Curated annotation (Swiss-Prot):
Alphabetical UniProt keywords: Ribonucleoprotein, Ribosomal protein
Species this protein is from: Lactobacillus johnsonii (strain CNCM I-12250 / La1 / NCC 533)
PANTHER family assigned to the protein according to its UniProt record, in alphabetical order: LARGE RIBOSOMAL SUBUNIT PROTEIN UL13M (PTHR11545:SF2), RIBOSOMAL PROTEIN L13 (PTHR11545)
UniProt xrefs under InterPro entries: Ribosomal_uL13, Ribosomal_uL13_bac-type, Ribosomal_uL13_CS, Ribosomal_uL13_sf
Oligomer status and interactors: Part of the 50S ribosomal subunit.
General function of this protein: This protein is one of the early assembly proteins of the 50S ribosomal subunit, although it is not seen to bind rRNA by itself. It is important during the early stages of 50S assembly.
The name this protein goes by in its record: Large ribosomal subunit protein uL13
Length: 147
């Protein structure tokens, strides 16, 4: 009986992808990015091995929030001091720090362990169109083809 071949970290060839977030909803962008970071788009996907690729997200400031998420979706953080709970609506976070909004959204879709942290570190988000990874020769990905 043949067994399923499992991927090894040394056998994986990683690619670099650029995704343009202009006029794309936050959830659709995040699910596509999380899937690529996990390696679920590859035939040799193995859940306990980091098989994913690198992702560069550009124009994060131009993504859109659908419905009433700009006012109703709240992101919380705590300073570890009494009364230190801070709440920021998604619309305000998009205006002030769109990179953080995309990072929080994608991070919530990855595993909460060391493997998820390794996968998260392969994502690079930029608010504008310029990025500093031209030397890696990233391929452009159309988000509409992934969904």
């Amino acid at each position: 009986m043949r067994t399923t071949p499992l991927a090894k970290t040394s056998d994986i060839k990683r690619k670099w992808y650029v995704i343009d977030a202009t006029d794309v909803s936050l959830g659709r962008l995040s699910t596509a990015v999380a899937s690529i970071l996990r390696g679920k788009n590859k035939p040799q996907y193995t859940p306990n091995v980091d098989t994913g690729d690198y992702v560069i997200v550009v124009n994060a400031a131009k993504l859109k929030l659908t419905g009433k998420k700009a006012t109703d979706k709240i992101y919380y953080r705590h300073s570890d001091y009494r009364g230190g709970l801070r709440a920021t609506p998604a619309g305000e976070l998009l205006a002030k720090n769109p990179v953080r909004l995309v990072e929080l959204s994608v991070k919530g879709m990855l595993p909460k362990n060391t493997l998820g942290h390794q996968e998260f570190m392969k994502m690079h988000v930029y608010a504008g169109e310029d990025h500093e990874h031209a030397a890696q020769k990233p391929e452009k990905l159309d988000i509409n083809e992934l969904i």
